[in-house]
Amino acid sequence: LKMFSLLSEFGWKPIMEKENIIGLQKQGKSITLEPGNQIELSGDKLNNIHEACAESHDYLFELQQVTKKLNLKIVSAGFDPISTLSEVPNNPKQRYQVMTKDMPNGGSLSLDMMYRTCGTQLNLDYDSEKDFIKKFKIVNSIVPISIALFANSSIVEKKNSGFSSYRSKVWQETSRGGLPEVFFDNMDFEKYADFSINFPLLFIQNEKEYLSGSNYSFSDFMNGKISEINNRLPTEDDLTTHLSTIFTENRLKKYIELRSMDTCGWDCLCSGPAFNTGILYGNLDEAYELVSKWDKNKIINAT
């Protein structure tokens, strides 16, 4: 709360959930806290990598000024190198309480993912369904390369984990995550819609309360089969929330979200986005032709 209060000096406004401040917003940007109080910047829609890099460094400068005043240090790594799971302070956000209860049922390291990992995520646009198909095929095919290039999470609980990216290991043993085989079969909008609709719900928002959705799919929601919320039908906000709980290495919203890179130090913050934009906004057809020859099973098993 002290950090959020000091950030208000830079024009950030609070986002409230009941009596709790759960984030900040300014223009098209927001700052939120993940389950283990990892700090996340969601940037504005920008035209190029240079604008995105400048925005990130402005945000980090503001954060640096605040942490100096509070005598805090920032750890920029893909996994908490010090704390045990039980030592991580919990975020009071309601949805995280439901996730903490249900997520371990589908993956043994799900709570480590929630409370101890940090990633560099990149949102990229597409201008047609054909463009999306090519880009989505490429980004899924290069996931092992992205993990290897930007690995930054070898230390766990003050010891060498034996992994260059322990964060990646955790994500492979996390509920609702991974690289689904169907992502390599020329995934188009209709196929992704089918995948998402039949994907299990994580939670359901009933007015201001979050309920477990573990017994239902989004298809059940669409067909009015969830008695706990009086069989109401989903809104666009419900769909947006559901899409954000599909924790695959890459996913589709109104943009393509790339999620396989560890958080890295400030000096390499723009490297991951530059790597991916170079591939996807360079010779797209050449990259697509190359990855189309790769064995999807080898890609999946390499992560």
Q: What do these predicted ranges mean?
A:
Residues 216-299:
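Long, well-ordered mid-to-C-terminal structural blocks that present hydrophobic/aromatic surfaces
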Residues 1-108, 116, 254, 268, ...:
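Terminal catalytic/cofactor-binding subdomain
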Residues 79-251:
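Loop-rich catalytic cores of soluble enzymes, especially ATP-dependent carboxylate-amine ligases
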Residues 45-52, 125-132, 262-266:
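A generic structural motif
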